Swiss-Prot record:
Main subcellular localisation: cytoplasm
SUPFAM superfamilies recorded: DTD-like
Record keywords: Cytoplasm, Hydrolase, RNA-binding, tRNA-binding
Species name: Clostridium botulinum (strain Loch Maree / Type A3)
InterPro entries noted in UniProt: Daa-tRNA_deacyls_DTD, DTD-like_sf
Name of the protein in its database record: D-aminoacyl-tRNA deacylase
Origin organism lineage: Bacteria, Bacillati, Bacillota, Clostridia, Eubacteriales
Length: 149
């Protein structure tokens, strides 16, 4: 399971011109799910994301987590995080989990976050979305539950 985690001032997702999810200060998470992912990957990534110390304290040091600041989180599915561009010029998405199986893991991830964070918004799985991200910093972290980077 992979995530692009961005510290944001605000973020929102639109589908067909309608806002379906929005947050204030917190994290925008683009989430990719692979064929190898299990509930252990959900647990690992959830703990890592909500406890990442990427918010500034009173001394402007990155010492506070999403939980520490009581921030919001928006989670957007993005299978393209498993795009393999090593051969040719068109990405291969063969490692990405698709369909119903990915949808189930995506929802389990969201539910695990909701147990820890008060304001959780999401995109729409499988939809063509417009994602608006007002970065703060910018601070962007790449995470992989298999620890490949």
């Amino acid at each position: 399971m992979r995530a692009v985690v961005q510290r944001v001032i605000s973020s929102k997702v639109e589908v067909d011109g309608k806002v379906i999810g929005s947050i204030g200060k917190g994290l925008n998470v683009l989430l990719g799910i692979s064929k190898e992912d299990t509930e252990e990957d959900i647990k690992y990534l959830k703990e890592k994301i909500i406890n990442l110390r990427i918010f500034e304290d009173e001394n402007e040091k990155l010492n506070k987590s999403l939980l520490d600041i009581g921030g919001d989180i928006i989670i957007v599915s993005q299978f393209t995080l498993y795009g393999d561009c090593r051969k040719g010029r068109r990405p291969s998405f063969i490692e990405a989990l698709g369909g119903e199986e990915a949808y189930i893991l995506y929802n389990k991830f969201i539910e695990s976050i909701k147990k820890e964070v008060n304001n959780v918004a999401t995109g729409e799985f499988g939809a063509d979305m417009k994602v608006y991200i007002e970065n703060d910093g910018p601070v962007t972290i790449l995470l992989d539950s298999k620890k490949t980077f």
